[in-house]
From Swiss-Prot:
The entry's keywords: Allergen, Disulfide bond, Secreted, Signal
Tissues/organs with expression: Expressed by the venom gland.
Cell location: Secreted
Pfam families attached to this UniProt entry: CAP
Segment forming the signal sequence: 1-23
Family to which the UniProt record says this protein belongs: Belongs to the CRISP family. Venom allergen 5-like subfamily.
Positions of the SCP domain: 68-212
SUPFAM superfamilies in alphabetical order: PR-1-like
Name listed for the protein in its UniProt record: Venom allergen 5
Main location: secreted
InterPro entries named in the record: Allrgn_V5/Tpx1_CS, CAP_dom, CAP_sf, CRISP-related, V5_allergen-like
A single Gene Ontology CC term: extracellular region
Length: 227
């Protein structure tokens, strides 16, 4: 669907401006990868999308619950040895896979990054208590509709089809399976996500960012302990 002429939009905000940006001095955080912290560089939840037309940003309470449930359902599927996909499959069961809990600070930093409408990983997103990992997903349609955030999470899960469980995590895993491995990294305890929907030319896009703490995807380490 082409967009022409004047467009009048009411931007729907579904996230409360959390106090973390004011309570924490992110400019003092030194990330292991270097760079200026995302919450320091951009400083607020105000979208900064250039000529893209922002439709809405943030996640509802229900969407947060759905995202968390999808993560934990998938982690428990792996833990029970019920995932048959892989290269080769199946994935072995895990004995140290715990459920994730939602973390509002991780969600705040993820939302700040999502609101830049820049697809890809930011450089510095760590918080005071740990290093932070990240998954990103972007979908688009020429129809005026936006994918449910759980559908974007499932895109990360689907990377399991390319994962070889017989070896430890390596740099070769990042491109094809890095989102999957972060989702099921056993030592990761918390997750928080941000979302923005916008129009770019004829495309209606939904961008989801999830931050994870402590971070996963460490070289030559196992995703989890097998039974």
């Amino acid at each position: 669907m082409e967009i022409s002429g004047l467009v009048y939009l009411i931007i729907i905000v579904t996230i409360i401006d959390l106090p973390y940006g004011k309570a924490n001095n992110y400019c003092k955080i030194k990330c292991l990868k270097g760079g200026v912290h995302t919450a320091c560089k951009y400083g607020s939840l105000k979208p900064n999308c250039g000529n893209k037309v922002v439709v809405s940003y943030g996640l509802t309470k229900q969407e947060k619950q759905d995202i968390l449930k999808e993560h934990n359902d998938f982690r428990q599927k792996i833990a029970r040895g019920l995932e048959t996909r892989g290269n080769p499959g199946p994935q072995p069961p895990a004995k140290n896979m715990k459920n994730l809990v939602w973390n509002d600070e991780l969600a705040y930093v993820a939302q700040v990054w999502a609101n830049q409408c820049q697809y890809g990983h930011d450089t510095c997103r760590d918080v005071a208590k740990y290093q932070v990992g990240q998954n990103v997903a972007l979908t688009g349609s020429t129809a005026a509709k936006y994918d449910d955030p759980v559908k974007l999470v499932k895109m990360w899960e689907d990377e399991v089809k390319d994962y070889n469980p017989k070896k430890k995590f390596s740099g070769n895993d990042f491109l094809k399976t890095g989102h999957y491995t972060q989702m099921v990294w056993a030592n990761t305890k918390e997750v928080g996500c941000g979302s923005i929907k916008y129009i770019q030319e004829k495309w209606h896009k939904h961008y989801l960012v999830c931050n994870y703490g402590p971070s996963g995807n460490f070289m030559n380490e196992e995703l989890y302990q097998t039974k």
